[in-house]
Every structure is written in C-alpha cells, then in structure tokens.
C-alpha cells in the first residue's frame, strides 16, 4: 500500500520517496504476519530457503545452512520436511519467524503475530520473540499482548482508530498514561 500521509524513514531516507530503491530496503526488513503466509506446497525447510535464493541470490547450500541455523533457533529443526498443513499454528508462526530471520534483516516487523493462535500456542511464539529482543534484534510489533509489550519494549505507541493517542517508554505508558483513551484501554487490560 502507498501511505496517504506521513513518512516512513529508514536509515535517514524516506522509503516513500519515489527516488528511493524500495526493493533494497525491503531486503533489510523482515516481516512476520498473523496468517503466517507460508507456501503450503513447500516443506518447512523450502519455505526458509526460497526467499534467500530469490531475493538475496544466495546459493542453495548457504541458504540451507542459514535456514537450519534459524529453524534450530526457534525449535523447528525437527520439522524440516513437514508441510505447513502438518503444523500447529504456533509451529507455523515459528517457521515464519525463522524464514524472516534467515534473510538476516536489520529490523523485524510483526503484525499481530499471536492473534491467529490458540491461547496455549501464544506463549511459545512470545518466548521466541522475547529471545530475539534479548539478543538485541530491532522489532516493531503490532500486538494486543500488553504484558509482553510492557516487558520487552523500549518504546510503546498506543494507537486507536489509526491515530496515535500516546507514545513513550513502557513505564510512561503503562504506569502513568496521560491520554484518556490510553487510560481506558489499560483499565480494561488490568481488569
């Protein structure tokens, strides 16, 4: 989608600017979607290799090595030959995270990574994300997992109806919100 207003700045450059090579920036940004977006006709391993060979032009052996490294990191290496239909939602999301990591991005964008999961699967995905945060991975996470956001983030933006209501440190937002809409939302969260 093309933004209708505002700007997206990465490394000091406007990504929205028509003169900027958006494809070059996309190669530095990993995305993990709520619906996983895995290729159903490919194995777990193939899902983690294809982007590397097509976008980064890595040879297949190097791509396989990277894929195995990140599948191991998220605990999915025993499932390399499985197809997505054979996996639980939490397993699919961990494969999606491994696929994004195999591209070795500078930042990972997560769009509601736990919203499509059964409650018992949420924890395993959040644990992987918590590990990434502890390792210093820059992440932009859209989430309703408030405890996770409070514990892991260093900057929180609360939005409602597409508008930023308030932003600040986790302690600013969760312990001393200033905006009425933020206060109302957090009161329901604490209830």
Tell me what each language-model feature is.
Residues 1-170:
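ABC family nucleotide-binding domain
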Residues 160, 167, 171-191:
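C-terminal boundary and immediately downstream tail of ABC-type ATPase nucleotide-binding domains
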């Amino acid at each position: 989608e093309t933004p209708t207003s505002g700007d997206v700045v990465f490394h000091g450059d406007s990504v929205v600017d028509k003169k900027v090579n958006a494809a070059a920036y996309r190669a530095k940004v990993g995305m993990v979607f709520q619906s996983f977006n895995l290729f159903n006709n490919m194995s777990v391993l193939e899902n983690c290799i294809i982007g590397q060979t097509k976008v980064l032009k890595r040879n297949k052996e190097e791509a396989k090595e990277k894929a195995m490294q990140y599948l191991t990191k998220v605990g999915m290496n025993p499932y390399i030959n499985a197809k997505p239909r054979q996996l639980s939602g939490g397993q699919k999301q961990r494969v999606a995270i491994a696929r994004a990591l195999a591209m070795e991005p500078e930042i990972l964008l997560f769009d509601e990574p736990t919203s499509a999961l059964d409650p018992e699967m949420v924890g395993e995905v959040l644990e992987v994300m918590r590990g990434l945060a502890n390792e210093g991975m820059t992440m932009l996470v859209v989430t309703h997992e408030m405890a996770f956001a409070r514990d892991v983030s260093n900057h929180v933006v609360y939005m409602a109806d597409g508008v930023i209501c308030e932003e600040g440190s986790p302690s600013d937002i969760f312990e001393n919100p200033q905006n009425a809409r933020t206060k109302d939302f957090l009161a329901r969260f604490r209830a």
